[in-house]
């Protein structure tokens, strides 16, 4: 079924919404944990359920390489395969056009890209991307796009934009012919406002179920990220979900909500957890620091996650000191719980009309 989006309340530009999907309802704004290979690193589906995750992201390109479409179809899609009953959004593989650009070849047909697993060259087209995402059975499919790298010239950014539009048309036609999965179009345009405006006009003219802002948070300065987002958001329809691709820092999330964005994803909370960094309501914490050697308090006194209910800073520091994977797992649980709690508090603050106050509290500790 195609998604249904309800805009429940606004507080200035901040939006409180609800997305109805085949595998459940998603309350927005919300953060999506990233499960690239059909798992969120160091988390079981039960862990994700307990922290309150509503929807997760998986990556079509990586799942195409392993386990492959045959295995996914054998399991009737990713939900049965990984034992996750809630909604899933899949990245089309467009980001790999950016991240695996060494040796790639881009044509109107698609992208010839090197597999990070065995070095073989794979031709990814919009049609193949849709076929992969159909075999995955995701609730939300992303159109295949060209995510341009920072520093790209205006001339080259035009080429990337035109390919993104062409591939969006082909993605939409392809997925509509094979399934009733919902699909989001992606606005590109690099860091050029005239191209952002053109891309938004072209992509929103198509019958997508939602829209994403792509090509940002890829290494540019923070001010540029916000400037481009603030410029782009008003160009998107109010009656459809808005997804910013690649936002995981608490500061960025509250700033994007303030601009009218609904959905976010990033590996940041899980990646920093594996390196000993906790996200708390008083800012970041390096639990490997010597000052926590004898500290019997939880990571965050305000947190109700499994980790904070059961373990001390001292113990988690010890686990990292000895290289025990359990330390990474416990911090991953905590960080993702924090992101879900942040999302929930954002929703409550929009409902209650005090979002600016909450945003101010977050910005006080995350600069």
Curated annotation (Swiss-Prot):
Enzyme Commission identifier(s): 2.4.2.29
One cellular component (GO) term of this entry: cytosol
The keyword Zinc appears for this protein: yes
Cofactor binding annotation: Binds 1 zinc ion per subunit.
InterPro entries: ArchSynthase1/Queuine_TRR, TGT, TGT-like_sf, tRNA_ribo_trans-like
Keyword tRNA processing attributed: yes
UniProt-annotated binding residues for Zn(2+): 303, 305, 308, 334
SUPFAM superfamilies xref list: tRNA-guanine transglycosylase (SSF51713)
Enzyme class, broadest EC rank: transferase
Catalysis performed (reactions): 7-aminomethyl-7-carbaguanine + guanosine(34) in tRNA = 7-aminomethyl-7-carbaguanosine(34) in tRNA + guanine
Active site location: 91 (proton acceptor), 265 (nucleophile)
Cofactor(s) it depends on: Zn(2+)
Sequence positions that bind substrate: 91-95, 145, 188, 215
UniProt-annotated stretches for the region RNA binding: 270-274
An annotated Gene Ontology molecular function: tRNA-guanosine(34) queuine transglycosylase activity
GO biological process: queuosine biosynthetic process; tRNA wobble guanine modification; tRNA-guanine transglycosylation
One Pfam match: TGT
Pathway, per record: tRNA modification; tRNA-queuosine biosynthesis
Lineage top rank: taxon: Bacteria
Keywords: Glycosyltransferase, Metal-binding, Queuosine biosynthesis, Transferase, tRNA processing, Zinc
Family: Belongs to the queuine tRNA-ribosyltransferase family.
Function: Catalyzes the base-exchange of a guanine (G) residue with the queuine precursor 7-aminomethyl-7-deazaguanine (PreQ1) at position 34 (anticodon wobble position) in tRNAs with GU(N) anticodons (tRNA-Asp, -Asn, -His and -Tyr). Catalysis occurs through a double-displacement mechanism. The nucleophile active site attacks the C1' of nucleotide 34 to detach the guanine base from the RNA, forming a covalent enzyme-RNA intermediate. The proton acceptor active site deprotonates the incoming PreQ1, allowing a nucleophilic attack on the C1' of the ribose to form the product.
Assembly notes: Homodimer. Within each dimer, one monomer is responsible for RNA recognition and catalysis, while the other monomer binds to the replacement base PreQ1.
Entry-linked PANTHER family: QUEUINE TRNA-RIBOSYLTRANSFERASE
Descriptive protein name: Queuine tRNA-ribosyltransferase
Species annotation: Thermosipho melanesiensis (strain DSM 12029 / CIP 104789 / BI429)
